[in-house]
Amino acid sequence: GSESRVVLLTGKGEETTMKRGSTFVPYPSDVELTLKYLAEYDAAHSPAPAAGGRKAKKDFLPIILGSDENAYGTARLFREAYGVTPLLLCTQQLVPTRHSHLFLCRIIPDFEREEVFPDALLGVLKQCAQDYEKLLVIPCSDYYTGLLCRHYDRFEGLIANRFISDELLETFDTKDKFYALCEQYGMDYPKTVVASPEERESVVDRLPFDFPIVVKPENSNALDYLRCHFEGQKKVFFFDAREQYLTMVHSMNQSDYRGKLILQEFIPGGDDAMRVLNSYSDLDGHVRAMCLGQPVLEYYDPKSVGNYAAILSRGDQALYDRMQEFLEKLGYVGFSNIDMKYDSRTGRYVLFEINPRLGRSSYFCRAAGLNMMKLLTNDVVYGKREDCVYNHTVALWQNVPTGILRRYVKDPDLSEELRAFKGTHVIFCKGDLPLSRLYRLLRYYAAQYHNFRDYYFEKK
């Protein structure tokens, strides 16, 4: 409103307060830049007066939670489909979203904390609802998704899109719970042992499978794991021998991480044996889109190991049919991101986890021609639903330089196939590459050569 109090942080850390008609202000480097953005915001978001002099509300506003590649890709999809300027909420801007003109960014300190998130988001939603008919909230991380599910009753009537219930989320928010769900519905999953903090050392002597093994926290994206620190910390661990595992456990036990550990048999195959399935289920729980991807290379640095660096979109109708039945039996709504691996010993896919949101690599769907945000908006805002779309287009998405793919994709046939495609890069968007942004992105890409040189290993 006209009496809004806006706090401007100057480059020297000083505060300036002023009254301004605009509700939102991006995180500025100085006062002059902020005033420029405020003017741009007013021009872009002030609805034209309706008949009778009252302001007409715009159809919808996307509100994106996060600032990684996923957040940037989501903003790209909305801008491409509807020409709208999303609002991005985060605790800090990461490299993929810095110096971008695709959205407006608002920094909210401690936004990911349970005691801050509900009131902060509620305030934003109430302000936005004055100018927009419908608000779409898109979380780009597990913890934002969890916060939305747990506190959704606070936002009911303000958020147009739906999320799974907190009760359903509880059935798969950790890997041990997800495997119990797989058992219930007859889905394949890797042989698994769950160890409490007290069992971390002793469990290695009672494993029903041999080394090599894969070890993960029960939720590697949970804040309690992300905020703890110990030597050798990774999202996913691969161990060839008992002694390697115990060395990691001794280090972990010195930290304040008290979550469970998941120990699994290693399914034979490298990165290209992995599969990722992105889906959208409408407000009534019917699957409306599915896109399968074959990762051809993963990241290997400790903070990103297990994340996908490049994906070829694929199609597998038998898998689509089976996973659609699974999701609809669950009563799933919204986006899902399912990680799995092809087991060459059985010819079947084993499931690793469901992420109740799209992942960092989900722009591979757009490379295949599928805009997930358009499906969401048509469903929730405009009430348009069509038959389920099953992707069968092959296309390449990559988040690393092509030179890395040529060097580290070891399968000769796959390497040859990659040469036929020009990769889609989510963070390099034509028309959104000012020099300040381009400089950071090129440094970001160049650093990947060092990361792969230092951390890459062959999974056998």
Please give the residue ranges for each predicted region.
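Active-site nucleotide/adenylate-binding loops and adjacent lid/helix of ATP-dependent enzymes
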Residues: L169-I262, L283
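ATP-dependent carboxylate-amine ligase
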Residues: G1-A51
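ATP-binding N-terminal substructure of ATP-dependent carboxylate-amine bond-forming enzymes
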Residues: A44-I164, E201-S202, R453-E458
